[in-house]
Amino acid sequence: MTTAIHSFTDLGTIHHRLSAGTYVITDPCYVFPDEMWSDLCDKIFCREDEGKECPESGVIEMDGHQIWWGQTAYGDGGYAVRVYGSKVGEFGVDAGLFAIFPVEFVKKYKPDLLEEKTLACTLSMPAGVVSYDGGDMDCGQVAVCTSSNDEDEEDEEDWGDDPDDNGGDSEDD
């Protein structure tokens, strides 16, 4: 018996209410069974020749669960999950998307993912409203930023601080 996606809602910039609970933040390609992944991709990724705008975020309802999802700003990579600004975990992205799954859903479809600390971040979240803007998600105390790279920002802050770096004016130049 194949389980199907019951509904798919394009939220755009509309906010989504999330109940308190334990959630997994990861790329949905790691969680959805193969037979559902292609159906989901047809709904999320638009072909330019169809003349439709692709949704940037939305909610999928399946098996009595609501799964919020959003596109990353720059595609694949590794992204931090922050609580009150402090990094509490990270997750990998291979499909340019990230989602907030109820842990029960992940336990049913991909329980091994809960052990993958670089592909998924599991955390308890209070009730809140998920907001999305250009690849960034905020839900009260929990935030994911994909529109800038934390490591790049740290590197930029440190640029020029190396005492051995004389700005390219070495005797060898």
Could you tell me what each predicted segment is?
Residues 1-173:
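Intrinsically disordered, low-complexity acidic regions enriched in Pro/Ser/Thr
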